[in-house]
Regions:
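Positively charged n-region of N-terminal signal peptides that target proteins for export
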Residues: 1-4
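Bacterial N-terminal signal peptides
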Residues: 7-20
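Conserved hydrophobic positions within beta-strands
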Residues: 41-43
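Short aromatic-glycine-enriched beta-strand elements
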Residues: 49-60
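Short, basic/aromatic beta-hairpin or loop at an interaction surface
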Residues: 65-78
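Short nucleic-acid-contacting surface segments enriched for D/E, G, S/T with interspersed K/R
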Residues: 81-99
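OB-fold/S1-family single-stranded nucleic acid-binding modules
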Residues: 102-129
């Protein structure tokens, strides 16, 4: 009987530990995956860090006001596997890029990157499927 109780407690513990981990690794926890956006602007900074690369860009919003956007992306290892390096992003700083992604649920100028079009016209799709 004691081993059944211990097994039950361990099962509950595993569920309690793994559910938050799953939520952390799910973009839909932070981003509204149904609200795709496209932003064109100037790439200002790239944080080439784990666990996710972050790009910062300035884009003109309503009324011509400059908005400071932040997009989270895949990890550096993913980019290396597809042949994109930190230097590729460094060359693009100060130039115009277009990104497609999904916006944060809280409505801030924060998104999850699904596509990036570099200044030379090269487009990199970070997901499989239809990106609007």
């Amino acid at each position: 009987m004691r081993s059944k109780a211990l097994c039950g407690l361990m099962s509950v513990w595993v569920l309690l530990v793994t559910v938050p981990l799953w939520a952390h690794h799910s973009p839909s926890a932070i981003f509204d995956m149904t609200k795709q956006i496209s932003v064109t602007g100037t790439l200002t900074k790239v944080d080439w860090i784990n666990p996710h690369i972050v790009i910062l860009m300035d884009a003109k919003g309503e009324g011509g006001k400059v908005e400071n956007w932040k997009f989270e992306s895949n990890p550096p290892s993913w980019y290396r596997r597809v042949g994109v390096t930190r230097a590729d992003f460094a060359k693009a700083i100060g130039q115009t890029i277009t990104v497609g992604g999904v916006r944060a649920r809280n409505g801030t100028l924060f998104g999850y990157l699904l596509m990036i079009k570099m200044p030379d016209g090269t487009q990199l799709d970070l997901v499989v499927g239809d990106i609007k």
